[in-house]
Curated annotation (Swiss-Prot):
Catalytic activity from the UniProt record: tRNA(Thr) + L-threonine + ATP = L-threonyl-tRNA(Thr) + AMP + diphosphate + H(+)
Chief subcellular location: cytoplasm
Name of the encoding gene: thrS
SUPFAM superfamilies: Class II aaRS ABD-related, Class II aaRS and biotin synthetases, TGS-like, ThrRS/AlaRS common domain
Annotated stretches, region: Catalytic: 247-544
Cofactor: Zn(2+)
Compartment(s) where it occurs, according to its Swiss-Prot or TrEMBL record: Cytoplasm
This protein's name: Threonine--tRNA ligase
Gene3D superfamilies: 3.10.20.30, 3.30.54.20, Anticodon-binding domain (3.40.50.800), Bira Bifunctional Protein, Domain 2 (3.30.930.10), Threonyl-trna Synthetase, Chain A, domain 2 (3.30.980.10)
Source organism of the structure: Ruegeria sp. (strain TM1040)
Biological process terms in GO annotation: threonyl-tRNA aminoacylation
InterPro entries: aa-tRNA-synt_IIb, aa-tRNA-synth_II, aa-tRNA-synth_II/BPL/LPL, Anticodon-bd, Anticodon-bd_dom_sf, Beta-grasp_dom_sf, TGS, TGS-like
Superkingdom: Bacteria
Length: 648
């Protein structure tokens, strides 16, 4: 039999018969590893212990201590176990797909009766019974005709459709435990008992169209979460409880920031309080960009399809665009326009006005650009996933030699912004060349090297995402980690030599000839709407004082203090503090509770003593104790706190 060489993580290599399985490799290494092994990685691919290895490869054997692989297997197995449990309880249910997602999995079912929240407990109980049976998980590769016949005989039309969509040269792999079977690429654990029965929970039920197509069958989706141990599950559930308290939709109502309504799906109605946050943040970003050498522009929101065709967006992005047909002066053909889904083609039009020299580069162009993108109604989520939004968009037109310095400069800019907004924990990911791409390997080498060098120059490490770049260039992604451990990808920097070529951007080089600039698409916040949602949840509504829409409420304890209340408000406003009076005929405790729910950072209570002594009683949000201070000292302190950090 032919021999193959398997190389282990420590660099050692061993020879084996071709067709050996990772389970057999683990047994060859040690009896202990054979018992603990759950899967392998073979040449970078997660590999089932039962799959044969037929050629030379790098191999690593995984155990439950390898959390990434263990979680994937546990969640994948639980998707199958849940589908089996559902069909054992309700045999007429048809199964579709059940992928692993972040922190868990889901499975879509076609069932006449709707699932209820009470059903989740019943399903969980049945799942634990299956786990406790410790039945072996086996796999077979079937011929296409056999698989289609099997699913046709068992009245599983969705599986038949899935098989029809699988490329003909791809093997059809079937996984079994007990007498239940599913079409699946794998990998899986070796028996159901390897799944921790106390570390999973079914979370919710939702509707989902088959294959995401609203013209197809509406299915029922059950979501679950799972981890390698019950303590991790407990921590995750605690995090979800905290996330519910911080939900920007809930806090948005309590703070009277915004609302959404059916007549404008995916678009925000900003209330005065919310718009104050928006404009304060935008003013801050405008000053920061101006300081960093950006020129601000404003471009049309409705643009003829001709530009989108030329830029390539019409072919690649049309389904996400809002199309507008206009009868121009009763012309024979209606003009076809689109609300812009992004600003970059318009920025190239601005760049193209007038002759540009190499001395004009780098040219940093910024716009708070209003964009519109179609999102399915089921994907909309408060102000974090919308159809109408404003980007803090920017495009740097530069030479290839300037990519590193401009990227390093942007990283420093982004770092300052995130710190000012209360985010100190963030990471950088570098997405490299995909298989389908334009440009030579040398060009990609240079672009990727430039981004990596920029990160190092700015003093930051980065993670490489192999093959995740756009077809026209690599990119950096900047991901925030919030107070409860969730990750939010916000900032980006994308290298692009394609759009300047398509839209004929050029500058005159030192040699007197025309050259194409490189475009660096960059954003710090992403969109104002989404970032404000993240800010609200990060700070649980207790925004940094300078961003708070209502910074101070001066509340009267007695009506005899009303005049002094108004005087205090005017004094604070004159010092640049957003202050308002509350002289309603209500008890002070009621006022304090109401304004605390509204996340007002500071409440100043004023009664007889404060009037006589020209003081105020200071209560800060989240603190139970009050402190009496002079109006002069409080005004000075709050004026400083109300000053945006870039102006200090």
């Amino acid at each position: 039999m032919a021999q193959i060489s398997l190389t282990f993580p420590d660099g050692n290599a061993r020879s084996y018969d071709a067709g050996i399985t990772p389970a057999e490799v683990a047994a060859d290494i040690s009896t202990s590893l054979a018992k603990k092994a759950i899967s392998a990685t073979v040449d970078g691919q997660h590999w089932d212990l039962q799959w044969p290895v037929t050629q030379d490869a790098a191999i690593a054997i995984h155990t439950m201590k390898d959390e990434a692989q263990a979680n994937e297997l546990i969640r994948h197995d639980l998707a199958h176990i849940m589908a089996r449990a559902v069909q054992e309880i309700w045999p007429d249910t048809k199964v579709t797909i059940g992928p692993v997602i972040e922190n868990g999995w889901y499975y879509d079912f076609d069932r006449a009766e709707p699932f209820t929240p009470e059903d989740l407990g019943t399903i969980e109980k049945k799942m634990k019974e299956i786990i406790n049976k410790r039945e072996p998980v086996t796999t077979e590769v079937w011929e296409r005709e056999k698989a289609i016949q099997y699913y046709t005989d068992n009245n599983e039309p969705y599986k038949v459709e899935l098989i029809d969509s699988i490329p003909g040269d791809e093997p059809l792999r079937m996984y079994w435990h007990g007498d239940w079977q599913d079409l699946c690429r794998g990998p899986h654990l070796q028996h159901t008992g390897q799944v921790p029965g106390d570390a999973f929970k079914l979370m919710s039920i939702a509707g989902a169209y088959w294959r995401g197509d609203s013209d197809r069958q509406m299915l029922q989706r059950i979501y679950g979460v799972a981890f390698t141990g019950k303590e991790k599950l407990k921590a995750h559930l605690t995090m979800l409880e905290e996330a519910a308290k911080r939900d920007h939709r809930k806090l948005g109502r309590e703070m009277n920031l915004f609302h959404m309504q059916e007549e404008a799906p995916g678009q925000v109605f900003w209330h005065p309080n919310g718009w104050r946050i928006y404009t304060t943040l935008q003013d801050y970003m405008r000053r920061m960009q101006d300081r960093d050498g950006y020129v601000e522009v404003n471009t049309p929101q409705v643009v003829d399809r001709k530009l989108w065709e030329k830029s390539g967006h019409w072919d690649k992005y049309q389904e996400n665009m809002f199309i507008v047909e206009v009868d121009e002066d009763h012309a024979r053909e209606k003009a076809v326009n689109a609300l812009k889904p992004m600003n970059c083609p318009c920025h190239v039009q601005v760049f193209n006005q007038g002759l540009k020299s190499y001395r004009d580069l780098p040219l940093r162009m910024a716009e708070f650009g209003s964009c519109a993108r179609y999102e399915p109604s089921g994907a909309l989520h408060g102000i974090m996933r919308v159809r109408g939004f404003t980007q803090d968009d920017g495009h740097i037109f530069c030479t290839e030699d300037q990519i590193t310095s401009e990227t390093a400069k942007f990283i420093a800019f982004l770092s300052k912004v995130y710190a000012d907004l209360g985010f100190d924990n963030w990471t950088i990911k570098l997405s490299t060349r995909p298989e389908q791409r334009i440009g030579s390997d040398e060009t990609w080498d240079n672009m990727e090297q430039a981004l990596g060098d920029a990160c190092k120059a700015a003093g930051y490490d980065y993670e490489i995402l192999e093959g995740e770049g756009a077809f026209y260039g690599p990119k950096l992604e900047f991901t925030l980690t919030d107070a409860i451990g969730r990750n939010w990808q916000c900032g980006t920097l994308q290298v692009d030599a394609n759009l300047p070529e398509r839209l004929e951007a050029s500058f005159i080089g030192q040699d007197g000839s025309k050259h194409r600039p490189v475009m660096l698409h960059r954003a710090t916040l992403g969109s104002f709407e989404r970032f404000i949602g993240i800010l609200i949840e990060e700070h649980a509504g207790k925004l940094p004082f300078w961003l708070a829409p209502r910074q101070v409420v001066v509340a009267s304890i007695t009506s005899e203090a009303d005049d002094y209340v108004n005087e205090v408000v005017e004094t604070l406003r004159a010092a640049g503090v957003r202050a308002e009076a509350d002289t309603r005929n209500e008890k002070i405790n009621y006022k304090v509770r109401e304004h605390s729910v509204g996340k007002v950072p500071v409440i100043l209570a004023v009664g007889h003593r404060e009037v006589e002594e020209r003081t105020v009683s200071v209560r800060r949000l989240g603190e139970k104790q009050t402190k009496v201070e002079s109006l002069t000292n409080v005004t000075e302190e709050l004026a400083k706190a109300a000053t945006p950090p870039d102006l200090l």
